[in-house]
């Protein structure tokens, strides 16, 4: 979360992919549903969904937004939280900021490049920023 980047690194330590992200609006480690924090730690990919038809209401008065998750939703196995994942967006201007309800958000084009590199049960590590550590 410090650099607002997602990186795919192979077992030799070679970086295969990097892209800018948006993460949880609030600093710190996810504690409960609705806290707007991105979980920190070591997780696994539990599923990869086609999310093109999914909708989400951001409670901003605009109602349900089709395509809010972009073309794919990479679901993470996060104990106590069933809706955390890595996904695309309908709002690429949010990237590089803390704007999500807890997920990791990418540009749809970057997500399309990431998908061939991801498989179940791949390991995902989410590291805190210095400010996240202060808030924990």
Predicted regions and their residues:
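Intrinsically disordered, low-complexity
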Residues: 1-33, 40, 125-136
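Conserved hydrophobic positions within beta-strands
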Residues: 43-45
